[in-house]
Amino acid sequence: MHGERPSLEDITLILEEIPEIVDLHCDEQFDNSEEDTNYQLTEPAVQAYGVVTTCCKCHSTVRLVVECGAADIRHLEQLFLNTLTIVCPRCV
């Protein structure tokens, strides 16, 4: 469009065929027992977690890496919050 206001002369309509409507729902069905078997065989995700804490004797920084699942790292966190402490190699 050129000018300050649009006019009918500036508008061009391009009429094409209307696209065909396609049903996207699939009627394919799976055997549920096969899906359940595959799900049960997968192991829980294991990930590496970095743990930074202090030595209970000299209060120096101690860093370690553990590999475990999400539930296990939460359990480890609870142990640190309760009575579990780490001793650095120098204080052992």
UniProtKB/Swiss-Prot annotation:
Q: Which intervals of this chain are the motif LXCXE motif? A: 24-28
Q: How is it modified after translation?
A: Highly phosphorylated.
Question: What function is annotated for this protein?
Answer: Plays a role in viral genome replication by driving entry of quiescent cells into the cell cycle. Stimulation of progression from G1 to S phase allows the virus to efficiently use the cellular DNA replicating machinery to achieve viral genome replication. E7 protein has both transforming and trans-activating activities. Induces the disassembly of the E2F1 transcription factor from RB1, with subsequent transcriptional activation of E2F1-regulated S-phase genes. Interferes with host histone deacetylation mediated by HDAC1 and HDAC2, leading to transcription activation.
Locate the region E7 terminal domain. 1-43
Tell me the leader sequence span.
none
Give the family, as the similarity comment puts it. Belongs to the papillomaviridae E7 protein family.
GO annotations of cellular component type: host cell cytoplasm; host cell nucleus
Looking up HAMAP family in the UniProt record yields: PPV_E7 (MF_04004)
Q: Where are the zinc fingers (unnamed)?
A: 55-91
What is a single molecular function from GO for this protein? zinc ion binding
Q: How does it assemble?
A: Homodimer. Homooligomer. Interacts with host RB1; this interaction induces dissociation of RB1-E2F1 complex thereby disrupting RB1 activity. Interacts with host EP300; this interaction represses EP300 transcriptional activity. Interacts with protein E2; this interaction inhibits E7 oncogenic activity. Interacts with host TMEM173/STING; this interaction impairs the ability of TMEM173/STING to sense cytosolic DNA and promote the production of type I interferon (IFN-alpha and IFN-beta).
* Keywords from the named record: Activator, DNA-binding, Early protein, G1/S host cell cycle checkpoint dysregulation by virus, Host cytoplasm, Host nucleus, Host-virus interaction, Inhibition of host innate immune response by virus, Inhibition of host interferon signaling pathway by virus, Interferon antiviral system evasion, Metal-binding, Modulation of host cell cycle by virus, Oncogene, Transcription, Transcription regulation, Viral immunoevasion, Zinc, Zinc-finger
For this protein, the record's InterPro entries field holds:
Papilloma_E7
> In its UniProt record, which GO terms are filed under biological process?
DNA-templated transcription; symbiont-mediated perturbation of host cell cycle G1/S transition checkpoint; symbiont-mediated suppression of host innate immune response; symbiont-mediated suppression of host type I interferon-mediated signaling pathway
Q: Which domain of life is it from?
A: Viruses
This protein's species is Human papillomavirus 57
Respond yes or no to whether keyword GTP-binding is given for this record.
Answer: no
Q: Where is this motif: Nuclear export signal?
A: 73-81
| Domains as described in the record | The E7 terminal domain is an intrinsically disordered domain, whose flexibility and conformational transitions confer target adaptability to the oncoprotein. It allows adaptation to a variety of protein targets and exposes the PEST degradation sequence that regulates its turnover in the cell.
Subcellular location per UniProt equals: Host cytoplasm; Host nucleus
Name it.
Protein E7
A Pfam family this chain is assigned to? E7
